């Protein structure tokens, strides 16, 4: 068996026909500048071929469901193991998916609660236990003294009004003699007169016995009596000894509330993804989509007539719906010509929520007329009706995005399960209480769990699995997460590390794992734990190929491959390979230069100072501890702290929505805070995030940055275009005219295959050029519009060097490290980091007046040391123009270049949410409380 993966002639994307030998059962890092071909080698060649071979071994029937990966451009790969990819792009957006479900910890917890959980009445909290007849008999004999007198009662009425005459008659017919009515034993043959307006309790006397231990005849009679009593009362029995009632049931039934019964405790009962246990109101999601009345108010400064309020079905301001709305306004004296903010609250309530009072409505049109009384249910109800009655997915989606908000379910209060399921506990905690704890606290609970000998025997293996999986999560730096956290809210790095923890839990050996920057989103303190985990995965007998830029990860690796030397067309070669020490000594390796300290990102000679601040007072969203924070303006501020400390809560979920609403007239929902000062010092806020720049292949860097508008202008002004009478619109691939109609300007055509995946092939009419023949006959400097779209940013910069306005915009894309991507590269093929840098470039190319706050969350994602250096130069330029830049970041090369740092923590989750330290990097490095300071101290000395 080969001890290497031997790759020959890899040509995928920009790879230059390279041959690579990767040692097996080792921790291998592939590094290089952005666009050098790292992902092309690791994911698009090695993993893709491993996956393709596995799928190809399946039957044609199975392949139609699984799909198939295309064969990568490579001559041969030998020694390939079964491959598993752990990327950041595959975050689960399913609202039902939680950290607990994807790690399978919740499945084991369901098993645990089903076997050793204690059920309670959800109304009064009384413990409800279920016992078989044999167990009840055993319990009575063990629990009570010999020769004790007992009465066996069967409860038939519990706290119900009525005379119950028919019940008494039926009991006599069945042969029963006595009953206990409201605590008093009466003969059923006697006249029992009950007040029909009062609540009563009635139990049938089944038998009266004297306890005789070891007497088989007594045990037989007791067993028969209990069975009879349970038949009468559907599984419930009361044993009265010395005037005290002892309740037993073969069902989970409350003795105080006979209408409350808990189903049999099975694992599926504790699943919020199954109807047995899920809250019936929210169907187990914990949230409900509701129309947000604030979103229906479009502009408070406008009148209703001028569009200040959205009236469903009346966007054209004419017709039945609009006329009826105006009739309602006239009936209730609502002035629809004044600004919405001046309408009295009582009248606003009628507009939003309607009224029962009917009004006269007369309507005339060509088609029909109406004269009569109508009722107005309010625009909120009308919008809900439109949402639930439409069959159009796009209409539904528009209403969701524009007018609805997710709110906590009012029945389960966001806990997803039925109340009777939440009443089942272990050590006074229900299953959701445990899921709401941090992983660290949850492990502590299970480590300190006190169980009976019988429970210990049942739960031993289940607890072992739960504890191991929780430990794996802690080892990859996710101790601050809760098991209840929806996976759709996780960052790419978090979701990747969860899958990593799950893989370690699986205990597989002989597997090839391909990972994409697992250190993303991790504080330097947690990185050590991650590296131990990766080494453990390797030591199980697996091969790890990790695409990574983190210095510590490279130093820990067994082997490094450095790709480059540049990006795009200038990359795709193996520049250096070997142990970390060998790569450090390689003169050709840019990575080696940074690792040995020959090249580095310099610490600024002086830090900017600021006398203006935004002061956010009383922030207490998520884990923030009612903090007040002053963020300086006009400088570069970095927000630091361990994973889960509250950085994103403070900046992305509190500060940004406040600024966006106040400055950009937005309608976002910030988390709880008291007040904010200093807004007079800024004019607008821009969040440069990692969401895609477009959802379709038609969006690309050229269209997003508006570069393509100028390029189309240039082509429209050429001699060829003027002769043919072509305007700027002719050079758009999104509209009819100049585009190829066979592929509608996409350049590719999708072919659906039955037993194979959908195949995207080059359009055979335009040959992938997007435009028709006539449009491609127009040339600028010997190039068609299609040729220009296929240029890399670096090539386009040289090509348009004589046009200052265009050269300036393209240079910004170059400066943020995107010289390797193509102008027309589809948005769907860009990573989150690339999308973020395109947005940054778009902002930089705009004329700036200063006084803008830019917010970036981990902009170094996917960046090599050299790319980080370029990025920081660009961000410093933004600040030099009089703007404020706020960055959430773990990268110490970025942190050391900041003017000011705000460190949040000290830990993640509940133990975070405080300001640990603030000041210049030098001041933070002196802080004894700050984990960031501890690691920063070393970097400032470099």
Predicted segments with their positions:
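Conserved phosphate-binding elements of NTP-dependent enzyme cores
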Residues: 1-942
């Amino acid at each position: 068996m080969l001890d290497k993966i031997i790759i020959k002639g890899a040509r995928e994307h920009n790879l230059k026909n390279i041959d690579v030998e990767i040692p097996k059962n080792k921790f291998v890092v592939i590094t290089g500048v952005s666009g050098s071909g790292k992902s092309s080698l690791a994911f698009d060649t090695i993993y893709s071929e491993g996956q393709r071979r596995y799928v190809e071994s399946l039957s044609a029937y199975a392949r139609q469901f699984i799909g198939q990966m295309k064969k990568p451009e490579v001559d041969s790969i030998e020694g390939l193991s079964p491959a598993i990819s752990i990327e950041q792009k595959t975050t689960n957006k399913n609202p039902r998916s939680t950290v607990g479900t994807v790690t399978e910890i919740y499945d084991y917890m369901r098993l645990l609660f089903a076997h050793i959980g204690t059920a309670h009445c959800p109304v009064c909290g009384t413990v409800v236990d279920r016992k078989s007849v044999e167990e009840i008999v055993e319990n009575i004999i063990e629990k009570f003294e010999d020769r004790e007198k007992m009465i066996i009662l069967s409860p038939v009425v519990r706290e119900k009004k009525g005379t119950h005459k028919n019940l008494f008659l039926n009991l006599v017919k069945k042969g029963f003699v006595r009953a206990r009515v409201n605590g008093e034993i009466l003969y059923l043959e006697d006249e029992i007169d009950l007040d029909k307006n009062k609540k009563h309790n009635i139990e049938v006397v089944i038998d009266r016995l004297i306890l005789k231990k070891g007497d088989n005849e007594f045990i037989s009679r007791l067993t028969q009596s209990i069975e009879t009593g349970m038949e009468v009362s559907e599984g419930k029995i009361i044993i009265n000894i010395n005037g005290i009632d002892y309740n037993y049931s073969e069902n989970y039934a409350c003795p105080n509330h006979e209408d409350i019964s808990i189903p049999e405790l099975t694992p599926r009962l504790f699943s919020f993804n199954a109807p047995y246990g899920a809250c019936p109101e929210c169907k187990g999601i914990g949230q409900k989509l509701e129309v947000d009345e604030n979103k229906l108010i479009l502009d408070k400064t406008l009148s209703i007539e001028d569009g200040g309020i959205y009236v469903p079905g009346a966007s054209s301001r004419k017709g039945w719906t609009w006329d009826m709305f105006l009739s309602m306004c006239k009936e209730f004296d609502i002035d629809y010509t004044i600004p919405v903010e001046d309408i009295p609250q009582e009248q606003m309530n009628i507009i939003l929520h309607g009224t029962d009072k009917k009004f006269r409505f007369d309507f005339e049109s060509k088609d029909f007329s109406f004269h009569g009384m109508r009722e107005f249910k309010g625009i909120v109800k009308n919008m809900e009706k439109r949402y639930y009655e439409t069959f159009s997915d796009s209409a539904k989606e528009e209403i969701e995005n524009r007018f609805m908000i997710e709110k906590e379910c009012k029945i389960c209060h966001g806990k997803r399960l039925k109340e009777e399921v939440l009443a089942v506990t272990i050590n006074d905690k229900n299953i959701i209480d445990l899921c709401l704890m941090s992983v660290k606290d949850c492990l502590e609970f299970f480590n300190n769990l006190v169980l009976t000998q019988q429970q210990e025997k049942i739960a031993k293996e289940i607890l072992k699995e739960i504890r191991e999986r929780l430990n794996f999560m802690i080892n990859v730096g996710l101790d601050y997460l809760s098991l209840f956290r929806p996976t759709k809210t996780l960052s790419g790095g978090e979701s990747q590390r969860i899958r990593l923890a799950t893989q370690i839990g699986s205990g597989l050996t002989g597997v090839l794992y391909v990972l994409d920057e697992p250190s993303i989103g991790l504080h330097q303190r947690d990185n050590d734990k991650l590296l131990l985990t990766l080494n453990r995965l390797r030591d199980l007998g697996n091969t790890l190929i990790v695409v990574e830029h983190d210095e510590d990860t490279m130093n820990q690796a067994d082997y490094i491959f450095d790709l480059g030397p540049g990006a795009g067309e200038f990359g795709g070669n193996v520049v250096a390979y070997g142990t970390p020490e060998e790569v450090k000594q390689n003169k050709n390796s840019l990575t080696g230069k940074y690792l040995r300290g020959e090249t580095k990102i310099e610490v600024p000679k002086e830090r900017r100072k600021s006398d203006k601040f935004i002061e956010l007072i009383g922030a207490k969203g998520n884990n923030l501890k009612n903090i007040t924070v002053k963020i300086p303006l006009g400088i570069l501020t970095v927000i630091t702290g361990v994973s889960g400390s509250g950085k994103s809560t403070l900046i992305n979920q509190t500060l940004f929505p406040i600024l966006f609403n106040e400055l950009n007239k937005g309608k976002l929902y910030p988390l709880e805070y008291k007040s904010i000062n200093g807004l007079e010092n800024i004019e607008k806020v821009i969040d440069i995030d990692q969401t895609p720049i477009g959802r379709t292949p038609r969006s690309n860097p050229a269209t997003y940055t508006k570069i393509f508008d100028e390029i189309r202008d240039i082509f429209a002004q050429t001699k060829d275009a003027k002769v043919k009478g072509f305007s700027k619109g002719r050079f758009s691939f999104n509209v009819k005219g100049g585009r190829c109609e066979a592929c509608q300007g996409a350049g590719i055509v999708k072919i659906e295959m039955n037993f194979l995946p959908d195949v995207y092939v080059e359009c055979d009419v335009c040959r992938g050029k997007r435009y028709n023949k006539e449009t491609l006959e127009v040339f600028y400097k010997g190039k068609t519009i299609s040729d220009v779209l296929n240029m890399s940013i670096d090539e386009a910069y040289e090509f348009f060097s004589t046009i200052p306005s265009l050269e300036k915009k393209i240079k910004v894309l170059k400066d943020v490290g995107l010289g390797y991507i193509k102008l027309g590269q589809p948005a769907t093929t860009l990573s989150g980091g690339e999308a973020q840098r395109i947005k940054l470039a778009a902002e930089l190319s705009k004329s700036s007046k200063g006084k803008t706050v830019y917010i970036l969350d981990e902009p170094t994602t996917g960046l090599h040391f050299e790319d980080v250096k370029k990025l920081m130069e660009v961000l410093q330029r933004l600040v030099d123009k009089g703007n404020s830049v706020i960055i959430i970041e773990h990268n110490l090369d970025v942190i050391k270049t900041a003017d000011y740092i705000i460190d949040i923590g000290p830990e993640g989750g509940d133990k975070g949410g405080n300001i640990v330290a603030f000041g210049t990097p030098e001041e933070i490095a002196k802080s004894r409380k700050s984990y960031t300071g501890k690691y920063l101290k070393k970097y400032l000395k470099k």
